[in-house]
Amino acid sequence: EFQIMEGHMGDFWCQSTSAIDIRSYPAEGVMNRVANAKQPFRTFRSGQEYFCLRSENYESPDNEWTRLDLICFDGKSLHIVNGHVVMVLKDSRYILPDGKAVPMKSGKIQLQSEAAEVFYRDVRIKALTELPEEYARLFD
């Protein structure tokens, strides 16, 4: 989940039996892990490390629109807030009861709001033939 909530635009939450790898700092005690594009990929999965804070808060001031971009291509994903990459993710998958990982390569997009008012405008979906060059280096 690409969280859309005031104060937490771009955070990640695992849903159901999902798992994913995110460039993030290692956990420190009970503190949540924080995304950082210069860190190695670390696994997040339901029931364990299931939440990751975005790298920084790039939200717009109150009463201004915040632009959100979610780029997904070939097992790689980016959470972008107002033009700033706040999370680098790869290998989204779900885990079967027998422990087998199944890649998530397609599915549905859901926009939602939990316990807070949110407005959407200019929602667009664009097919990609490749990961935009400016972001490809984040996966090296």
Task: Report residues per predicted region.
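Carbohydrate-interacting regions of secretory-pathway proteins
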Residues: E1-D140
